Amino acid sequence: MGEREKSASDAPGTVYLVGSGPGDPDLMTVKARRLLEEADVVLHDKLPGPEILGTIPEGKREDVGKRAGGDWTPQEYTNRRMVELARRGKTVVRLKGGDPFVFGRGGEEMEHLAREGIPVEVVPGVTSAVAGPGVAGVPLTHRDHASSVSFVTGHEDPTKEESAVDWRALAETGGTIVVLMGVGKLPEYARALVEAGKRPDTPVALVERATWPDMRVATGTLETIVAVRDREGIEPPAIAVIGEVAATRERVLDLLENAGGEP
């Protein structure tokens, strides 16, 4: 006989909010790998990437990213499902792309679980906000070009009456701006940054599917990047890096070419 399912009177199982990293399985943490093996159920969305999801047996995988017909699964359902499984004594991994606490709604889920009396543990992951630009050859800081970095979401809560992102303040910082999930809103914030005083020729790099086998990188400026996005067909998930550091990739490729090296 298999292990009996715990009753509601038994201690609940633990929910682990696990960051899977930017997509390359080799960039997952050792602890994340171990928990995926030990978990009874893995609740995931699409961001962990096909190579990582492919390592999880189908029998213990549940996709809470989308429903049939393409609609997003409501957050309320995910919250409810985590609690339901934990109260049945299951060890649950809530698998997220990147890091659970970087625009991943990990904070909201942690509070909900605590409110319901469910043990919860956070397992940090390598955030795509840093790893994505890194694998594309775009440093976020550089002694000659940027001494600060700002991370911004390009996909805010649609119920907000107005954006909480102050593009004018970001334009005035002079550092690097990294926009996650920002492909769709690119025209709006590129225009907002120029209107706020950023030079139209400020370099921009778009990194699509960072660290995945089909990763692509496109570069331009605030003035040209929307046309570049459309021409190259850059689609989500993608990261935008705005600032002088975004030109580093092309400089390095030119140096390698002139030196006879491989890009």
What is each model feature region?
Residues 60-66, 117-121, 140-150, 197-206:
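Short hydrophobic/aromatic-enriched beta-strand-loop microsegments
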